[in-house]
Amino acid sequence: MEPDDEEHIYLIDHAWTYTLDSAKAILNANENLVQRMCSIMNISCSNSSENEVIENILKEMWRYNNSYILQNTNQAGFFTRCWFIMDEFGSRIHHSEEPTFSMVPFFFCGDKMMYSLLFPAVSVTAGEEVTCNYPRLKNTLSEEMKMALKYPWVPSDLSEIDFSQSEPDLDYFMSGRHMEILPEDEYELPSLVHEPKIRLYTDYPEVSEFLTDPRFYSTTEKTKAHILWLFERLYDYKSLAESRGELFYVSQFPSEQVLINKDLLAIVCRRSCEEDEANINTFENCPKWLPTTYSLMIELPQFVSYFQNREKRNLDNVWICKPFNLARGLDIYVTDNLTKIIRLSEARPMVACKYVTDPVLFPKENVGLVKMDLRFIVLLRSIQDFELFVYERFWLRFANKPFSLEDFEDYEKHFTVMNYSDFPLQQMFCHDFIKQFEKVHSPHKWSDIENKIYKMIKDIFIASALREPPAGIGSFPGSRAMYGLDIILEWDRNHNEPQINPVLLEVNWMPDCKRACDYYPEFYDDILSVLFLNEIEGKHVVQL
């Protein structure tokens, strides 16, 4: 067989296609599928209960899994990741660093079915073994990285690898990212304080709907607007300033990806770690409010070592895997399965964050104690003069099922973002929450927890300004930005009396504030007055 021979393209069927949240339920309802998966994966069904067999399949299937994405045509940016296991032939194909064949997913419109195509990668003679490449494996990779990537099929002990973390060089901060082009000439930034009609261009419907302050009015002409409140990224500040002959206000900062991208956020936050705390061998978070986080793209060997060292010490090993730059709960997985984590890293660039296994829970009527997290709105008016504010009113997000360290595929148990799905959504005003929280978790005072949250937020933004772009957030005279910080509360039981500490989950740029507007119709009046008119009094903000 020759690689360019069109006669040697073979179709491989998929034995099972599913989404991760439905896998266990499908197996529980289909005995024939269970038997077939046991046969494909060489799992013995004797001397094991039905539940044990299914759990073995769910663990072992990560040596066989592959995936593809189906885009949601009704909701931009939303998708479904489908996982599949090939038929008996496809699942028997071994991996090799010198593969003889290539394999790719193939969607056939005729029957609306997904298959895999197999075709020779090199000249192959009769009797040679059909092999495919290890995912992500390249000859240029280090031996440690190769061992980590091959782990699902060739398990090895990597615990001797140094799992301490260091800050990558500037190339990493620039890799795959657009750098902003800033004006070189000195342009004037017009003051808006005495401007009777402030022209605002926005592509956010909520801003147009809820902004009632008569000093602001909407315009469709971007080049004539005083303020650009944008959903899309702006990279060429220079050309826009030149076309206007003056500077402008815009709802973003140069290089703010160091806060938004989860891999960079972890790097930035580690700058807040005190020297006497910076000992990763204690297996403590550093800083305490940042979950231990590894980039699975560049730190996979270190992560595997850290995982195996925790395992040897009988420490819990539950992790949450998140894409670098997605939000709204998309493509996020909770697991304690090392093979699964490594295979997830093939799907897209991801981080593995230590899962908060002892969260502060909240009673939900007719349900029980559920997981919750908090969304705080943070306003950055200047990074150079460090003008930072937090909106006093936060909002709550609750899981729908009682929390426990099991059933990690159960979205309603382990996740709280329900407003982009068909799951029930519980809503509560923050002032009502505080009263009930102090009642449930007495003697803990919300004011003490709030002070910790505010200090954490300030530390995050200080850390982001410690380096020049692209390793730190940049400065532009007209930059004003709003960020949504997702925070969870965690028990610290290392004291005589348990303490409650905040833990950062992620930072979102220009967050969805529809719920904030529904709760507080004056929300955008407050936000824009603080950012662009320097008004603080009566605007429900605290300066940090």
Segments from the language model and where they lie:
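Short amphipathic alpha-helical molecular recognition features
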Residues: 81, 85, 116, 122, ...
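C-terminal SET catalytic tail plus cysteine-rich post-SET Zn-binding segment of SAM-dependent SET-domain
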Residues: 97-197, 510
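Catalytic cores of histone-lysine modification enzymes
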Residues: 1-100
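Conserved N-proximal alpha/beta basic substrate-recognition cap immediately N-terminal to
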Residues: 201-318, 325-327, 334-337, 343
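Conserved beta-strand elements of beta-rich interaction domains across eukaryotes
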Residues: 2-6, 15-19, 23-25, 32, ...
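Surface-exposed beta-strand-to-loop junctions
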Residues: 108, 190-191, 239-249, 284-288, ...
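Catalytic core of tubulin tyrosine ligase-like
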Residues: 314-317, 324-482, 488-500, 514-544
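Acidic, Ser/Thr-rich intrinsically disordered and amphipathic helical segments
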Residues: 92, 126-129, 144, 202, ...
